[in-house]
């Protein structure tokens, strides 16, 4: 009986750590994707990267972010704290996806609406939200 209880406790502890680790990994991966997108956008604005390469980079960054989001959606958090962490991360990732979409639209736009500056501001805001979430999650 004690062995069964200890086994169940170990499983619950591992599962709880798993949610935290998964959220942290998703945030880190998304931060990397946003940083890459910002670099591509700045290189495009400086005339050092083609529009096609910038578009591909932004598409890849969005795919990475959506993969992280899908990973979080598959979690089954067991505690209220874990549920709140997952929900907050999903909210931030949704905002980041919107920022990436704005940046993609800016690169693809023939009439400069939205502008590259708007896309850059959206990506900077996304990076800030991810950084805040990283600090809140313990910097993992």
State what each model feature region is.
Residues 1, 16, 136-140:
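Extracytoplasmic/periplasmic C-terminal soluble domains
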Residues 1-15:
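Sec-dependent bacterial lipoprotein signal peptides
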Residues 11-27:
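C-terminal region of N-terminal signal peptides and the immediate post-cleavage residues
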Residues 23-101, 105, 115-139:
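Alpha-helical segments in soluble extracytoplasmic regions
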Residues 108:
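Extended lipid/amphipathic-ligand handling interfaces
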